């Protein structure tokens, strides 16, 4: 029997503590907050999007960085195993769009309470409101930890401190600091799954668009191209499509984002379609015809941007004006100012480099008995659901 310490009471820490206790180890979990699973309770707007029902192949498509590192952990405990784990412990899940899985109770609190019950049943000692301040290492082996309340000796220390996102939940990047001190390599860190700010100002906050083409460029080079849902904000753009994109390109500092509002048609097809509508309703105002294609608020923005008068009728519209509208519908571009910071980020992009860790055991290749799990590692995914999923089973 080993004395095992888990630092961090988030998803990966809770699962690590439970898994270690299952095989008879003496486990103690340290959490700097007064409650466990603080960040976990924010997922799915408080409903807790615990995992996803997608296939193995689909799962790995959504991993942005270092997906091969996850092959071994995934083979030991998959998303389907997670669903069965919850069900067997009295918390069945329900499936919603895009395979998102939620607890049947629709309460993130129930997920946290389940883990608390399991940990206490297995005699895991919980140190709440106690912050770990340093790791104790001797002769390249971890021997314990220092906290703001004392010193503790352990055979194994599992660091599950999370990243730097959602600072209000206690994530302050401690794991990275300790790794750097021990010469365990950490990649550059960036906020992930964040909104984008533009240089242009527009009065479209709250407007959402579904299944539009999203293209991001830097110096005219395409960095990212995908379909997704977007939301106009007071500062720029958010929504699932923007959040997913951000993790791919934030470190490349893009300068332009372009939206294709009608991705299933070419510019010529859009132009022909618009001409047909205008011929059919030649006495109608042009903006009313456009409102049959895109939201009214966006029509007003496009008309203003092209300096086209609101009162212009279809039969008064020139070929050049019509073509300009078609081109803007296919290429609505904005200059990128910046992305939101860690205070608004859902995840951290980057972390402890995976080549420093044994994927079968999550143990450091440099320090015996020291393991890193969850968001502290250089692993991130496109969506919150997939992200929570691999945080659990690492």
Please identify what each model-predicted range represents.
Residues 5-7, 30, 132, 152-168, ...:
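Short hydrophobic core segments
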Residues 34-36, 41-42, 50, 56-57, ...:
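An anion/pyrophosphate-binding glycine-rich loop and adjacent beta-alpha core
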Residues 47-95:
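Glycine-rich active-site loop/strand segments that organize a redox cofactor
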Residues 165-178, 182, 379-394:
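A conserved FAD-binding loop/helix module that cradles the flavin
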